[in-house]
From Swiss-Prot:
Its EC number is 2.8.1.7. It is an enzyme of class 2 (transferase). Its main location: cytoplasm. Master enzyme that delivers sulfur to a number of partners involved in Fe-S cluster assembly, tRNA modification or cofactor biosynthesis. Catalyzes the removal of elemental sulfur atoms from cysteine to produce alanine. Functions as a sulfur delivery protein for Fe-S cluster synthesis onto IscU, an Fe-S scaffold assembly protein, as well as other S acceptor proteins. It is found in: Cytoplasm. GO terms for cellular component: L-cysteine desulfurase complex. One of its GO terms (biological process) is [2Fe-2S] cluster assembly. This is Cysteine desulfurase IscS.
Amino acid sequence: MNPQLNNLTLPIYMDYQATTPIDPRVMEAMLPYFTTKFGNPHSRSHSFGWEAENAVEEARSMVAKLIGADTKEIIFTSGATESNNLAIKGIAKFYSNKKNHIITVVSEHKCVLDACRHLEQEGIKITYLPIKPNGIIDLETLKNAITDQTMLVSVMVVNNEIGVVQPLKEIGQICREKGVFFHSDIAQGFGKIPIDVNAFNIDLASISGHKIYGPKGIGALYVRKKPRVRVTPLINGGGQERGIRSGTLPTPLIVGLGMAAEIAYSEMEKDTKHINYLFDRFLNNIHKRISKVYLNGDKNQRYKGNLNLSFAGVEGESMILAIKDLAVSSGSACTSASLEPSYVLRSMGIGEELAHTAIRFGIGRFTTEQEVDYAVNLICSKIDKLRELSPLWEMMQEGIDLKKIKWAVH
């Protein structure tokens, strides 16, 4: 049982980039498909199958509507990791007899970088674009990186660690002018910021259910039909999903993703207003009470549900232990098991000592003002205590440049 504190349930969930709680309306929509409406959507000879197929197609149109796509352009997958792999490897396999170059960004999600590294071993050339200190790519650098051998550019819309929003419209325009396919991992932006695949000239986009208050284990890949984009499937089988992704579709999960997309479509403005208000309240109150706290990533070009802060003079891991009443992360959930400083922060040029102190606070649909205020009070009291104990903080107060210190390795 979670402890209660003035109607506040502890611990407070602030890791919305890692996953989101399922919206009760999503759960309600899914339940019948676990119990009475259990048909296989590919069974065409009876009403159980037809009922499931109708539910799947309705969900497909809800997902498509959220990004301005055609229903036929949505392929259901097990999540964004599979979608990213299918997009990048699928394009590489299909077009590698014509072209052999892919461009991505150093701060992409691990699964995009790993898919690219896998292709490098197969002889595909990969360019990893740098990012500016604000976390955004330079468009001229992208333009100059494209050659006549480039088949694909892959740039995520919202970074999972620092929340910055890349200029997708401009990137899409460059790709279209140069005749290069444009893939975007939109898992952290889908349903949270307006994304239009046609206005942005996106050819492939990866989607995740559990980042938008839907179930885990379901996602989608948008694949453009006009002009047609071809991908070689990773999974062979019964030819479901236009032959791109075989396997029996999980109707309850798809219904959940569809419902989550429908809610996001109708409530995006309300969610954005709520999240922006809490972001500003959190950041302003922290800055009023503590010195040397830095927001990582561009303040304006960002999704405000992500608040990545570095606290000078405090070790990130000890900070997380000190604020154990807040469920937060010191990086991507997929890589935070390793205590290495975040590769995203390092690629922004942030020094090791500040990268090590970074903590990501996530704000979402169900975060309350009371939770934010509790979090701020807790952080401020713990920071003061930790800084009193920190030799690094003492050295900083004395004006010693930590970058010039030679650390001994034991």
